[in-house]
Amino acid sequence: MNEYKYLINMLYRLFGVEVSSDVPEDKLNWNIILYQATLHRVTSVLFWNLQKTKKASTINNNIYKMLKSQYEYNSYRDKYCIKTASELTKKFKQNSFKSDFVFLKGPILSIYLDPGFSYRVYSDLDVLMKKESLSNAKKTLSNLGYKQGKIDKNTDEFIEATRTEIIAHEFGSHETVEFYRIFDNSINNIIVDINYSLFWKKNSQEDLFPPINIESFFKNHIYYTKNDESIIGPTPEQVFIQTCLHLYSEAVLFCWQYSWYKNWGDLELVKFIDIGLFLNKKLDYRLVLDLIREYQVEEAFDFVITQFKEIFPLFKLPRELEIFIKNVDDVNYYFTTLGEKKYWSSSIAERLFEQQSRVLDVYKNTNLEDLYAKKS
């Protein structure tokens, strides 16, 4: 479909791979493009692409205004989240944390991968720290006005978590109940997730990855800076590996995701944008390969690199990572909550924009009672 090709070519341009546009913008079905761009969290990239190709004036004016508003909102939120993460870096350091914490994902990726505009859409700040630092972190966040709980989507009201809910969540997972700082204008609301391990999702009763010692993430930390803001984070090589493993776990363990059947969080182009922008960076690939072997996550990299190449065959990979290109059929799988490995009946390129077909495929091959979404 021309609309799908348009979106893929848009990302090629973002990666610096020049491709031609075969179909004029005014001949495309923008209902499809806007729907898919929203689901894949790439509306800011879409607006950037229209401006880069000098085609913004050719689309419907109301669509243009909507995309521009989304672009400006994402730009504001990105800068605001970076500023908040920088402030929290200072506050945590002032409260005897020293360097036993780092920020993950969101603002770190935004600063390091920066393609010249705020391409990432993220709503929370993820912090990795030692579990013994949790009490100190809670006190710091509380003094700054943060409360643990959740937002009711139907009423937009904040519901504070009970002590029982907080303890149960910390006991049963790798993270705390989310911390919210609520403002009168919700555009300024901030969510902080505190994690005390990198990965916790399991393939049935077994860990998807061997436990990763987080001490090296603290020991080898660096500071990511932009516009006088400074955020503590892992080295770029560690961030790259964590980003790939996060994509992999979301892609193969989506049966654990709440309401996957309507959110389709297993496959989003924004996650592959992160990978593509990383691959354009000059990482220390000898270190990357050493860490992959140390963490014993070769299977995950077989999956990520092969699937990335399947979606973007024109992208030239770093030579060192070509060892992870496998037969695409061998990495076209997911796990049920019972730990069974199931194979898709379609390729990743075929189901990338066919969300409902993914659901039908999973329901055909997986007992409905094995899907977490159907248990809730």
Describe each region flagged by the PLM.
Residues 1-123, 129-376:
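Conserved NTP-donor binding/palm subdomain of two-metal-ion nucleotidyltransferases/polymerases, i.e.
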